[in-house]
Amino acid sequence: MNYRNITLIFLLSALFGCDKFAGVKVTETFNIENTYSELYVSNAINVVISDTAEEVKVTTGENLLPNVIIEEKDDILDIRLKDGTYFFNSTVNIELPVNPNLTKLTLSNASDIEGDVNAEELTINLRNASDAKLKGYVKKLTLNLKDASGIKKNIINNRYGLSCDECAVSMKDASDAYIHCDGTIRIVKLSGASDLHYTGNAEIILTGSTSSSSDIKHDVL
C-alpha cells in the first residue's frame, strides 16, 4: 500500500469516524423556572415536551454536552449550541416539562419538537427544515413556516392532533402543515409548493397570495 492510499484511508476515517468524538451518551438535568412564554430551539436539537417531566433533561455525547446552552432570560427559554460547535452524526435530545404559559415557539436549523400544547394563543415559527409534531388545543393559532419546514401529520381519532378555533397561516418554500379546525383558517400567504392539510369544518378565508403550486386540502380521515 503506497503513501497516498494510507493518507486517503486516514482522511476517510477521520471524516466518517468523527462521531466517536462526541463521546458516549450521557444525560444531565437542569432546573429552570418554567415561567417563560417563548421557546427558541436551534442547531438541529430535538425537543420532547413531556407531561411527566419535572425538570429539563439533556441527552447527548459526553463531549458535546458542555456545548449545549439552555438559557432562560426574562420570558424566553433559548436552547442552542455554542457558536462553531459541530460533531459529525451526533444528536442532542432534550426533554422539557409542559409549560402552560407558552405563547411563541420558534425552531430553526433542522430542529424538531413533539408533545402536547394547550394555549389560548400560540405562534409557531419554523424555518430551515424544522419540524413540529404536536397535539392539543390552541384557541388562536398562528403558523409561520418556511424553508421546507412542517407541522407534521399526527392523527388522533380520525382528525389531526393539533386543534384550533382560529388559524392564521403563512407558508412558503415547500412547507407543509396538518391541523384540525372547526372555526376559521385565514390564509395570509401560501406559496412555493407548500400545502395546508386540515380536518374539521373550517371556513377558509383568503386574505393574501396563494400560488398555483400550493394547495389547501380538506382531508377526511
Predicted features by range, described:
Residues M1-L221:
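Intrinsically disordered, low-complexity terminal regions
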